[in-house]
Amino acid sequence: GAWRTSKTGKNRLTLVFPDDLAELAVYCASGHEAGEVGLEWAKAQPGLSAGWWRRRDFPYGTLSVPDRTMQEILDSSIRNIYQAREIKNGLPIFQVGPTCYRGLWVVDGCFILEAMTYLGRGAEARAGIDHLLTRQGPDGSFDILGKYWKENGIVLYILYRHALLTGDMEWLKAKWGTVRTLVGVIKRLREASRKNPAAPEAGLMPPGFSDGGIGGINAEYTNVYWNLAGLRAAVEAARLIQAPEAADWEAEYSDFWATFRKAAKRDAKPYRDGLMILPVLMAPSPDILPVRGQWAFCHAVFPGQIFEPDDPLARANMALLDDNQSEGLVYGTGWMANGIWNYFGSFYGHAHLWLGNGPKAAEVLYAFANHASPLGAWREEQPPAGQDKKGGTFVGDMPHNWASAEFIRLVRNLLVLERGQELHVLEGLPRSWLFANAETALKDVATDFGPVSLHLKVSADGRSATLAVTKPESPRLKKLVVHLGAWAREGKVLTSREGRTYLFEIPMVK
């Protein structure tokens, strides 16, 4: 039988099909090339599309893990990012999403570009940075979202980290005018915040947009966190290339940090066990719980690295996040007060990792993965299972590729992480990746010291593991640290060396 149409509402047309319909192909086309197609043509298209994507030169195999599902999500994350990529003016531009997030967001782009650089695609990431820099305003600042002062600090971080990951100090020197200008912007913003010396934000940042669960223009801390992190990155960059500005910028950072600590002490609120937490808003609203908007705090922990591991404020805010979990992720920190911001899991996991809790970071990785779709993609935010009473309550694009980048970043950093002049290996290795014959590998993954390769193989009887690490050649790398968790049995670890490759025979708890 034939199908018929039924109007079911304004701007809506429903197709009603006969009961005996077994197969259906839907083909949407427009323009002079549109035409009728057959069912056999439609059946062939999924295979042709899949084959096309398989033939692309994408960095699959750079990160290899023994959990098949996690590997599929990793590969999907790489593919998601490339499927949303566009070529503009001859340059590859990585888009955050395909529809409502198809555009330039500085913080999203920062971590997408970092993830791709990890995977050996530094040239493509650099093109994305060049595109980003075209959005610098006439006054030298970045203000794409409006009073989103943190964009300036984020760009400083991007420039510094990209130079480290690619080992290209000449590129950093070529961008030094931009670095110098952005440090000046941060100084200028701090001065503007002092117009009213009695204002809570005086000496920090003017009132601005928090994002990540908190709207409006407020005296708040997300812009403070990221501009502290950006200024710290500028200081480290100046030291790296021995720029004359290093001492002046370090003094500015010290003053900024001291002003922040004084304000944080004023605004901290009592929590459990004597802890003092810091809400994002300097004048908290009763309608906004302290857990809301804590994304930039997590970024300040890592990659910002502005807090020492034993900092009481950092420990208190982490306890706040720990106490607000649902399905293994932080609950109510984003735009949905009753929802889960899926890839906030990476921010949260990275903060735990940096503060020395690798096993918790590994747990968070799996909770993050458990919120992916069957095809390995994420919404930005969603309600916990069974709590979407209205139906269709979600936030963000689909797929949301910042999430894909964060999954790549978290897997990479659980396996290899830079700590100053040290390279730490297996600090957040999931225990479930250590079954008999399991293999975990990194292949020429970019680090601050150059590419690193790693191969961990568990023996057939599960009683030992062999680790091979090909160490980067940078003279800045002073120490290679291998983390042996509860999975390693007490006993002597046998070590040897073949050129730049270090070998470890590790006895395991069976």
Regions found by a protein language model. Give the residues of each.
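Active-site core of glycosidic bond-cleaving carbohydrate-active enzymes
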Residues: 102-139, 152, 177-180, 184, ...
